[in-house]
Amino acid sequence: MSGKPAPAHRAVLLEEAVEALAVRPDGIYLDGTFGRGGHSGRILERLGPDGRLIALDRDPEAEAEAARRFGDDERFHFERCSFEMLQQVTDRLGISGRLDGVLLDLGVSSPQLDTPERGFSFMSDGPLDMRMDPESGESAAAWLARANEDEIAWVLKEYGEERFARRIARRIVETRQEMPLERTRQLAELIAEAVPFKERHKHPATRSFQAIRIRVNDELETLPRCLEQIPALLAPGGRLAVISFHSLEDRMVKRFLRDQAEGERLPRGLPVQGDARRGQTLRLVGRAIRAGEAELDQNPRARSAVLRVAERLA
């Protein structure tokens, strides 16, 4: 029932996120981003024998970790897929509209960043891949080899908020005419050369690597498709907790939750009672939560994390 001991990797905002779900021992919960199972493990600790946890992730290494840690726990069920498939999974399992909580921990897990072969990080050299699912889709190297300068510049500016997007895109196109871009260190050095001055405490490739990863994994397209499904899948009183790691994601989550909480204003003159709104599905729970100093001392990557919580209305 308890699963195997958790690995050294610790999920960001672990206690805060699980606390926000207000886990009931007999509840049904869904972890849309299993990663290495930090949040799932804590949810299972709070579930009783009649509780259920469904976890999703498109990373084959996450699937292996799920089997290793929780494969013998009858309360746990894993599906290898993107969280945009959430409703298909819950429909098939017969739990749509019955979920007591959904957790989304967006972005890249620390083990993914720390594995050079995955190609997410410029801190060590590896193949320029960046795919959450390395068995499908187009790698970062393949995209950079075919995209034109305008497309690359747009991605760097829109997804990475990179002020030197055009300079970097031009350098990428010039360089690939002489040699293929296939390694993370190769790309990081190219970007560092293209950026005219450096920000303190931030590698010049940080924004570009983020932007390319978002493009390769279609992250800002899949997120709204996932969010739109969730209100109808929650039971009344069910909670949604979302952890985002950069401003584009957080703005998207904040806007979605606000719109669901405010609903649609009805035209003046209609005979309605109370607040003249319809379509309200969620209520906001508290303010946005950020990591405390103790967690930041242990995990500096938590600095940009923001947790937002909402609850399904009856």
From Swiss-Prot:
Tell me which residues bind S-adenosyl-L-methionine. 37-39, 57, 83, 105, 112
The family database entries (Pfam families) matched by this protein are listed as: Methyltransf_5
Q: Does the keyword Cell membrane apply?
A: no
Query: Oxidoreductase as a keyword?
Result: no
This protein's UniProt keywords: Cytoplasm, Methyltransferase, rRNA processing, S-adenosyl-L-methionine, Transferase
Known role = Specifically methylates the N4 position of cytidine in position 1402 (C1402) of 16S rRNA.
- Write the protein's name: Ribosomal RNA small subunit methyltransferase H
What organism does the record attribute this protein to?
Thioalkalivibrio sulfidiphilus (strain HL-EbGR7)
